[in-house]
From Swiss-Prot:
Keywords: Cytoplasm, Elongation factor, GTP-binding, Nucleotide-binding, Protein biosynthesis. SUPFAM superfamilies: EF-G C-terminal domain-like, P-loop containing nucleoside triphosphate hydrolases, Ribosomal protein S5 domain 2-like, Translation proteins. This is Elongation factor G. GTP binds at residues 18-25, 82-86, 136-139.
Length: 692
């Protein structure tokens, strides 16, 4: 079946998202097996999974970049984005969800709703993505489907509607009860679960199945008046009517269908595929995308293949065989190989060359794609993640994909000067692929600084420098991205005057500095009556920014302050933009003593799951790291400890936690906020920075 011949109603753009180790990559592998894309099965723990195609992913058994793949099921075209579950890679999840119409949230049947599950769920909420839940690993000891369903309510505030019940638990898990058909589905044999059969519901589950069927029908009735009248009126309701009502409720965000299975044991995946086709939205079921035209007016963009082309570049990556690949979601119109399109963010033209449908690390050439589809474009020169591509003559801009600020940095330098240029090119390529990776230069040492979302994130980047680009680097210890801020308001009237032979320099500025909680930095000019000519005012802001970027206390960037230019004076001959830049810069430095400068540190939200007997040890250790415990709850024989800890005290924590709990505890961590560092610790940090 050719890609472009598929009707819009038959397209499903879905993401598979979950906590690390919940089994989403294995689930995707089974989907590819049953839809005929894979002939053999790749296992994550063997390092052979198709979707995990980067070397680092194969070694670590985690999914790092969203690999896109296309498959077909029952006449529907399914574009799948396999998203990472590690918190260091939330930018991958964020940008994937931005371009998807629906999602499958995979949960570990033993662990239930884990911290990263909450993070990706919040991201899906933010983008209004309808979703299904798949409770995986039902074959594992301790798996509890019903507890998982309860956690969807208590942890995620979801409204689950249960469509299946498990038959058997842990090793005796053999199938599911389908509450829509009211039949049991059994998998057996050594054919990787390809064959299954419908039977009568087992007698010992009949009563429970009837109870949950009633709950299902009542949940649907709450969201559909016609259905309610029929159901409570005792009329017969067909399977098709039930499915249509579940679809409407899912797409309308009224509830979340819940299914179960064991991807690793090849059970429950085909009904999950059926549910993707039956219940998740097509591009025509979602809200229109909003764009802006050149006048700044909002425009509704409909998924019409005959309208002018509009697409969003949601991912740029380097393919070892094809080179640069840009993944684009087509929101409107048709894109053909050979077309010339406009990148509305840089106003550059791009010629469309090879167009590819991707299957993890293999590819299929196509000549044309229409609205609703996801396609990879080879060789675009000037397009980055978040850019809008559109037809020339109809320039529109879509909202960009926002990357979080980095919280950790490392210094890198090439092992030989001959590799300096090679490293710079490699780093530039990696930054184009990954908006959450930032690069800067240490002006004092000349070293390149890589800034990212966590230790694992930067480890992977260093690994890729070596493997993909053959760049060997020396690496410094990880450093926390501290900030400075002001805590007191102060007004300064400062004059910069310099007279040497010939023209001199003159600029006077009167400025008010004050704390500002609503953002990083705000500059405002209240100059009236020509006290300072308009063309000199950008010089004032430039001088302030130069100090802001370098810091005053310990050379960390300054955030959270506002400067108002109140008044000033100029000289007809001696004033210039440069003179006002110097005046503002020196005034800022002069005011420093009065601004109550403080050091800010990144705080991390931490969640630790530990066996009960190590609870005291774990809490004591967190307290010693200046952590604050927010809550603690029981989860079976384990304890879940949530708290907030400074990032500076969390380096190498995974090894300390393993040794103190004999490897039985696990943790996750994500950035929470910047907060003022205690004065005595800040003083030590400042002394150390000044000494160096």
């Amino acid at each position: 079946m050719s890609a472009s011949s598929v009707e819009l109603e038959k397209i499903r753009n879905i993401g598979i998202m979950a906590h690390i180790d919940a089994g989403k990559t294995t689930t995707t592998e089974r989907i590819l097996l049953y839809t005929g894309v894979n002939r053999t099965v790749g296992e994550v723990h063997e390092g052979a999974a198709t979707m995990d195609w980067m070397e680092q992913e194969k070694e670590r058994g985690i999914t790092i970049t969203s690999a896109a793949t296309t498959c077909w099921w029952k006449g529907a075209k399914i574009n799948i984005i396999d998203t990472p579950g590690h918190v260091d890679f939330t930018i991958e999840v964020e940008r994937s969800l931005r371009v998807l119409d629906g999602a499958v949230a995979v949960f570990d049947g033993v662990a239930g709703v884990e911290p990263q599950s909450e993070t990706v769920w919040r991201q899906a909420d933010k983008h209004n993505v309808p979703r299904l839940c798949f409770v995986n690993k039902m074959d594992r000891m301790g798996a509890d489907f019903y507890r998982c369903a309860e956690m969807l309510v208590s942890k995620l505030s979801a409204n689950p509607v249960i469509l299946q019940l498990p038959i058997g638990v842990s090793e005796s898990f053999v199938g599911v009860v389908d509450l829509v058909k009211m039949q049991a589905i059994y998998w057996q044999g050594d054919d990787f679960g390809a064959k299954f059969e419908y039977r009568e519901i087992p007698a010992d589950l009949a009563e429970q199945a009837a109870l949950y069927r009633e709950k299902l029908m009542e949940k649907i009735a709450e969201t559909d008046d016609k259905f309610m009248d029929k159901y409570f009126g005792g009329e017969e309701i067909s399977e098709e009517e039930i499915r249509a009502a579940i679809r409407a409720g899912t797409i309308g965000y009224h509830f979340v269908p819940v299914l179960c299975g064991s991807a690793f044991k090849n059970k429950g995946v085909q009904p999950l595929l059926d549910a993707v086709v039956d219940y998740l939205p097509s591009p025509v079921d979602t809200k229109d995308i909003i764009g802006e035209n050149e006048k700044g007016e909002e425009i509704n963009i409909k998924p019409d293949p005959k309208a002018p082309f509009v697409g969003l570049a949601f991912k740029v990556m380097n393919d070892p065989y094809v080179g640069s690949l840009t993944f684009v979601r087509i929101y409107s119109g048709t894109l053909n190989s050979g077309d010339v399109v406009i990148n509305s963010h840089g106003d550059n033209k791009e010629r469309i060359g090879r167009m590819l449908l991707m299957h993890a690390n293999s590819r299929e050439d196509v000549k044309s794609e229409t609205a609703g589809n996801i396609v990879a474009l080879a060789g675009l020169k000037n397009t980055s993640t978040g850019d809008t591509l559109c037809a020339s003559g109809k320039v529109l801009t879509l909202e960009r994909i926002s990357a979080p600020d980095p919280v950790i940095e490392i210094a890198v330098e090439p092992k030989s000067t001959a590799e300096q240029e090679k490293m710079a090119l490699a780093v530039a390529r990696l930054c184009a692929e990954d908006p959450s990776l930032k690069v800067a230069s240490n002006e004092e040492t000349g070293q390149t600084l890589l800034r990212g979302m966590g230790e694992l994130h930067l480890e992977i980047i260093l690994d890729r420098l070596k493997r993909e680009f053959n760049v060997n680097v020396n690496v410094g210890d990880p450093q926390v991205a501290y900030r400075e801020t002001i805590t007191q308001s102060y007004e300064i009237d400062y004059t910069h005057k310099k007279q040497t032979g010939g023209a001199g320099q003159f600029a006077r500025v009167k400025m008010l500095f004050e704390p500002y909680d609503d953002g990083e930095f705000l500059f405002e000019s209240k100059i009236t009556g020509g006290a300072i000519p308009k063309e000199y005012i950008p010089g004032v802001e430039k001088g302030l920014v130069s100090v802001k970027n370098k810091g005053l206390l310990a050379n960390y960037p300054i955030i959270g302050f506002k400067v108002t230019l109140m008044d000033g004076a100029f000289h007809d001959v001696d004033s210039s933009v440069l003179a006002f830049e110097i005046a503002a810069r020196d005034a800022f430095k002069e005011a420093a003593k009065k601004l109550g400068l403080k050091i800010m540190e990144p705080l991390m939200r931490v969640e630790i799951v530990t066996p009960e007997e190590y609870t005291g040890t774990v809490i004591g250790d967190l307290n010693s790291r200046r952590g604050k415990i927010a809550e603690m709850e029981a989860k079976g024989n384990a304890r879940v400890i949530s708290g907030v800890v400074p990032l500076s005290r969390m380096f190498g924590y995974v090894n300390d936690l393993r040794s103190s709990t004999q490897g039985r505890a696990s943790y996750s961590m994500e950035f929470k906020e910047y907060a003022k560092m205690p004065d005595h610790i800040a003083a030590e940090l400042v002394d150390k920075r000044v000494a160096n």
